[in-house]
């Protein structure tokens, strides 16, 4: 017997459309102002560190696509109770990671090169488990790309170096993270 669901078809179409719309102009529809500012700073950090504008744009575009797709899945109640536990674990781990990133910034000489990459890899694994049954292998690749990019220990070391040209971006990122935490969005 053929299983057809217009709801599933509509969700699939919506995800497809959203995957094509993840550009900076569309971010404002799905991501709040503070998050958008953080994404802009992450782009600048990536571009300055890699010296590769195209790669930096791609990693931010992939991050936006994944965030939007997960948001669509969540809004359409597509996650099982077990997957919702994974989502909560991810949110908690991301919150702890943000607190750690802020602490490393605010308290000089506390940055440990391996801590943030480890947290980001844990977050990546949770997201991959969360979307395993919902998104395509191409989307899984995007998740890998984003987390692997920002978990680069050398990039993070430069970001936290008090004499680095990346440091002003870190201040803006941490200010944004603090705001999201205060507003209980992260």
Swiss-Prot record:
Keyword list, A-Z: Immunity, Innate immunity
A GO biological-process term: innate immune response
Disulfide pairings: none
One Pfam family named in its UniProt record: DUF758
GO cellular component term of the entry, any: cytoplasm
Database matches in InterPro entries: TNFAIP8-like, TNFAIP8_sf
Described function: Acts as a negative regulator of innate and adaptive immunity by maintaining immune homeostasis. Negative regulator of Toll-like receptor and T-cell receptor function. Prevents hyperresponsiveness of the immune system and maintains immune homeostasis. Inhibits jun/ap1 and NF-kappa-B activation. Promotes Fas-induced apoptosis.
PANTHER family in alphabetical order: TUMOR NECROSIS FACTOR ALPHA-INDUCED PROTEIN 8-LIKE PROTEIN 2 (PTHR12757:SF4), TUMOR NECROSIS FACTOR INDUCED PROTEIN (PTHR12757)
Domain-level remarks: The central region was initially thought to constitute a DED (death effector) domain. However, 3D-structure data reveal a previously uncharacterized fold that is different from the predicted fold of a DED (death effector) domain. It consists of a large, hydrophobic central cavity that is poised for cofactor binding.
UniProt similarity note: Belongs to the TNFAIP8 family. TNFAIP8L2 subfamily.
Protein name per UniProt: Tumor necrosis factor alpha-induced protein 8-like protein 2
